[in-house]
From Swiss-Prot:
Entry function: Catalyzes the third of the four reactions of the long-chain fatty acids elongation cycle. This endoplasmic reticulum-bound enzymatic process, allows the addition of two carbons to the chain of long- and very long-chain fatty acids/VLCFAs per cycle. This enzyme catalyzes the dehydration of the 3-hydroxyacyl-CoA intermediate into trans-2,3-enoyl-CoA, within each cycle of fatty acid elongation. Thereby, it participates in the production of VLCFAs of different chain lengths that are involved in multiple biological processes as precursors of membrane lipids and lipid mediators.
Family designation: Belongs to the very long-chain fatty acids dehydratase HACD family.
Name the record gives this protein: Very-long-chain (3R)-3-hydroxyacyl-CoA dehydratase 3
GO biological process terms on file: fatty acid elongation; sphingolipid biosynthetic process; very long-chain fatty acid biosynthetic process
Residue positions of the active site: Y288, E295
Transmembrane segments: 152-172, 192-212, 215-235, 245-265, 283-303, 325-345
Membrane-topology annotation of the record: Multi-pass membrane protein
Broad class of the protein's primary localization: endoplasmic reticulum
Coiled coil: 113-138
Source species, domain of life: Eukaryota
Length: 364
């Protein structure tokens, strides 16, 4: 009898955009769902298989602000996906009106990953419109938006030219010298690569201070990962600078960036070249894993050199007195490379699917 009177609640995961709320209800084989909204409250009740077996599950969520009626939902074999439109397009500091989060509610980290480039463009356009209205009301003849666009255009142009120089240089030398060009790649283009990677710090700063709408974390991870390879693995070890792997690392990095920076450059002047957009969202599929593989090979090749030279190794103080080799940290870094590959590959795939996936169908 106690089980019959008990209200069972499923696990619910949530995320948001400026205009929408996303809820993922962990119920499989759902039947007879009753999903509705009244002002700022979502009502859910359905028969399905959850944590307590096959039962009727229900919950009510009082949102932080008003939402539109008639939520859109989609049933899959494993879950229920619900999309709720906000009444006013804005970012909420939390989902529910009450500050304490319900026990059955948790963030949907897959959805909370960085917004796609298309969503960033929409946010940038909205911010541009608001800035323009504000500046016009103040009677200012100039707009901060134009200055921001000009600054970002020049930044992306400089990076595009730098990586293009590296890419063309390596391509021409390979066509002329063949495999012989592999072994002096570092001494030929390292200065330009140093310049481009140091300038990439600005990209992370731009995201951190709000000049761009890009998320900070992905930019920071790529910056630290590449600079570790460039400055530590290649820069401090002369024995690594004449290895063929340097060519492949630099070539793959530059191949990725010439399309990325050219895409961002055209976005700054409100141009949309469909061919370039397709390349920007597609070429990463082979290039990104190959780039990570080349980085991993460079780390593996450097391990015996660091062991032999003892560089960056240290001995723990008394009473432990254990020598810690730098190669130990390199082995950990190898695991991090492939973990990062998995996370970023999944995220980039979702970006591409959101850009080129099938149009959403409203399912009642």
């Amino acid at each position: 009898m106690a089980m019959e009177n008990q209200v069972l609640t499923p696990h619910v995961y949530w995320a948001q955009r400026h205009r929408e709320l996303y809820l993922r209800v962990e119920l499989s084989d759902v039947q007879n769902p009753a999903i509705s909204t009244t002002e700022n409250v979502l009502h859910f009740k359905a028969q399905g298989h959850g944590a307590k077996g096959d039962n009727v599950y229900e919950f009510h969520l009082e949102f932080l602000d008003l939402v539109k009626p008639e939520p859109v939902y989609k049933l899959t074999q494993r879950q229920v996906n619900i999309t709720v439109q906000k009444k006013v397009s804005q970012w909420w500091e939390r989902l529910t009106k009450q500050e304490k989060r319900p026990l059955f509610l948790a963030p949907d980290f897959d959805r909370w990953l960085d917004e796609s480039d298309a969503e960033m463009e929409l946010r940038a356009k909205e911010e541009e419109r608001l800035n323009k209205l504000r500046l016009e009301s103040e009677g200012s003849p100039e707009t901060l938006t134009n200055l921001r666009k000009g600054y970002l255009f020049m930044y992306n142009l400089v990076q595009f030219l730098g990586f293009s120089w590296i890419f063309v240089n390596l391509t021409v030398r390979f066509c002329i010298l063949g495999k012989e060009s592999f072994y002096d790649t570092f001494h030929t283009v390292a200065d330009m690569m140093y310049f481009c990677q140091m300038l990439a710090v600005v990209e992370t700063i731009n995201a951190a201070i709000g000049v761009t709408t890009s998320p900070v974390l992905p930019s920071l991870i790529q910056l630290l990962g590449r600079n570790f390879i460039l400055f530590i693995i290649f820069g401090t070890m002369e024995e690594m600078q004449n290895k063929a792997v340097v060519f492949f690392v630099f070539y793959l990095w530059s191949a990725i960036e010439i399309f990325r920076y050219s895409f961002y450059m055209l976005t700054c002047i409100d141009m949309d070249w469909e061919v370039l957009t397709w390349l920007r969202y597609t070429l990463w599929i082979p290039l990104y894993p190959l780039g990570c593989l080349a980085e991993a090979v460079s780390v593996v090749q450097s391990i015996p050199i660091f062991n032999e030279t003892g560089r960056f190794s240290f001995t723990l103080p008394y009473p432990v007195k254990i020598k810690v080799r730098f190669s130990f940290f390199l082995q950990i870094y190898l695991i991090m490379i492939f973990l990062g590959l998995y996370i970023n590959f999944r995220h980039l795939y979702k970006q591409r699917r959101r850009r080129y996936g099938q149009k959403k169908k409203k399912i009642h």
